């Protein structure tokens, strides 16, 4: 017997998106869709004047739906007023037939430009390449990032800056991508000139998706993806990038620092601004070079002394 699904869409201020998304993931056990946050426009700069975002959760169309809808309404009513610009609006429920479920999320993923030259496009979208563009083709699957989230975006921009400004236009090798997910950072590193990249993730499914995306981009010979633990990897990486939770960054601080070569770079993301000092304290042996922020997220770029 096939299962149809219900999409529950909630309109909230941009500042509330991550709070609501986390709640929906915990409540439903499924992924979420976010419209007009970073995926419905080619230029991220145009999003500042868009006050409301649509966050969509997904539930089986069964007897539990009404109870879940009420819990979502209660969460909105209780949590929403603490966010500037919030006005309560009841969630909108739409039925998604089983045959459409697997591909429904894809309509929200459009080509997006990040930094000066990087462009991320899904495999099913057409894109007219411009001079100088470095195009990443990606088929992330429902469980992995598209590259447009602020945490990933800031990592991509940091990689581009390090290569362009600090190393004459070419990202130095080797590069270590910790928590690779869909492999987008590793592919970007290769496009930016790195000749040797190691990509690790504790999730075998992430490694499988990364392998597929490497093949899509012709990078399979330059990136080595695996579930190898940090402890098993050698040191000497010129660039280490880790886009994972702040608590995990702190727990792995010693291992991450040890993987960076003298004079090398460590890019950390996945950090809520309120936890920035907590993370910085764990990496106090390194020099903090830059600290960009977007929405409630912070990215830290360190350099290891020679």
Swiss-Prot record:
Major site of localization recorded for this protein: cytoplasm
Enzyme Commission (EC) number: 2.1.1.-
Listed GO biological process terms: methylation
Keyword annotations: Cytoplasm, Methyltransferase, S-adenosyl-L-methionine, Transferase
Reaction it catalyzes: L-lysyl-[protein] + 3 S-adenosyl-L-methionine = N(6),N(6),N(6)-trimethyl-L-lysyl-[protein] + 3 S-adenosyl-L-homocysteine + 3 H(+)
Cited InterPro entries: Ribosomal_L11_MeTrfase_PrmA, Ribosomal_PrmA_MeTrfase, SAM-dependent_MTases_sf
Annotated Gene Ontology cellular component terms: cytoplasm
Subcellular location: Cytoplasm
Protein function: Methylates ribosomal protein L11.
Protein name in the entry: Ribosomal protein L11 methyltransferase
Lineage: Bacteria, Pseudomonadati, Thermodesulfobacteriota, Desulfuromonadia, Geobacterales
The gene coding this protein: prmA
């Amino acid at each position: 017997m096939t299962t149809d699904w219900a999409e529950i869409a909630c309109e909230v201020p941009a500042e509330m998106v991550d709070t609501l998304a986390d709640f929906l993931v915990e409540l439903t056990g499924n992924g979420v869709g976010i419209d007009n946050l970073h995926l419905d426009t080619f230029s991220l700069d145009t999003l500042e004047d868009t006050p409301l975002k649509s966050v969509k959760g997904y539930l089986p169309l069964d007897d539990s739906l009404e109870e879940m809808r009420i819990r979502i309404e209660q969460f909105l009513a209780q949590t929403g007023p603490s966010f500037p610009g919030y006005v309560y609006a009841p969630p909108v429920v739409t039925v998604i037939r089983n045959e459409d479920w697997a591909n429904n999320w894809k309509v929200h993923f459009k080509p997006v430009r990040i930094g000066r030259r990087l462009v991320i496009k899904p495999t099913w979208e057409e894109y007219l390449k411009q001079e100088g563009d470095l195009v990443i083709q990606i088929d992330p699957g429902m469980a992995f990032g598209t590259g447009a989230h602020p945490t990933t975006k800031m990592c991509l921009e940091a990689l581009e800056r390090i290569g362009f400004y600090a190393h004459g236009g070419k990202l130095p090798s080797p590069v270590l991508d910790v928590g690779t997910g869909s492999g987008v950072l590793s592919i970007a590193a290769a496009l930016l000139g790195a000749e040797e990249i190691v990509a690790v993730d504790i999730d075998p499914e992430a490694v499988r998706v990364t392998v597929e995306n490497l093949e899509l981009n012709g990078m399979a010979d330059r990136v080595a993806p695996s579930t190898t633990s940090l402890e098993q990897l050698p040191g000497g990486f010129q660039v280490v990038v880790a886009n994972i939770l702040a608590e995990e960054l702190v727990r792995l601080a010693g291992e991450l620092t040890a993987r960076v070569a003298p004079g090398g770079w460590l890019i950390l993301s996945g950090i809520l601004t309120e936890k920035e000092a907590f993370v910085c304290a764990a990496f106090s042996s390194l020099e903090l070079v830059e600290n960009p922020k977007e929405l409630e997220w912070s990215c830290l770029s360190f350099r290891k002394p020679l």
